[in-house]
Amino acid sequence: MEYTGSQYIGEFVDGRMEGDAEYILPTETKYIGEMKDGMFHGQGTLYFPNGSRFDAVWEKGLVVKGTYTFSDGLQYDTENWHYCDSYDRRFYTEICYGLKPAGISQLTNMDPPRKIPPGCYDCGDGFYNPNTRIVKDYNYRFLRNADDDEHEWIVRTCRKGWDETMGPEPKS
C-alpha cells in the first residue's frame, strides 16, 4: 500500500486482504465491504469524493451486479435511462423541485452552475483542459488523463468555459 498511496483497514489472511474491510484509494474513493484473497468479493460499496456511490456484489474483483447513485440521489438505470435526453431534458433537481419560471434557464443540475476556468470544460466530475488532456476535480486535484474517446466526447458534449456566437454575427 505504501507504493500505491492506498490505505487498508481490515484483516489479513495468509498476507492477503480478507474479510470486512475499508480500502481507501489515493483519489479518496473509498471501498467498504467484503474482501477475499486481496480482491473485492461479496457485498461492497464504492464511495466517491463527489458524494456518489456504487453498491455492488463483487466476485474476484469484478462486478456481478451493481447500482450507481449520483450525489443528488438519482439512481442510474441501465435499462430505461432517459435522464436529460431528447425524451425529457430536465435535470434531476428540476424533476424534484420543479422548473424555473420562463426566462430563467437552469444550465446544469447544480444551480447556480460552477464557474468553468477559461479554456476548460465541465465534464461532470471535474474540469477538463483540452490542451493538456487532464481532468482535475473541482478542487483542482488531478483525476485522470483523458483518452481520445473521452476527449472527443467532452469537446462535443460538455459545457465550455467561454461563450460562442451561434448563428449570424450580430451587427455592430
From Swiss-Prot:
MORN repeats lie at residues 8-30, 31-53, 54-75. Its main location: other. Gene3D superfamilies: Histone H3 K4-specific methyltransferase SET7/9 N-terminal domain (2.20.110.10). Keywords: Cell projection, Cilium, Flagellum, Repeat. It is found in: Cell projection, Cilium, Flagellum. SUPFAM superfamilies: Histone H3 K4-specific methyltransferase SET7/9 N-terminal domain (SSF82185). It comes from the Eukaryota. Pfam families: MORN. GO terms for cellular component: sperm flagellum. InterPro entries: MORN (IPR003409), Morn5 (IPR042814). Transmembrane segments: none annotated. PANTHER family: MORN REPEAT-CONTAINING PROTEIN 5 (PTHR46437:SF1). This is MORN repeat-containing protein 5. It comes from Bos taurus. The lineage of its organism: Eukaryota, Metazoa, Chordata, Craniata, Vertebrata. The gene is MORN5.
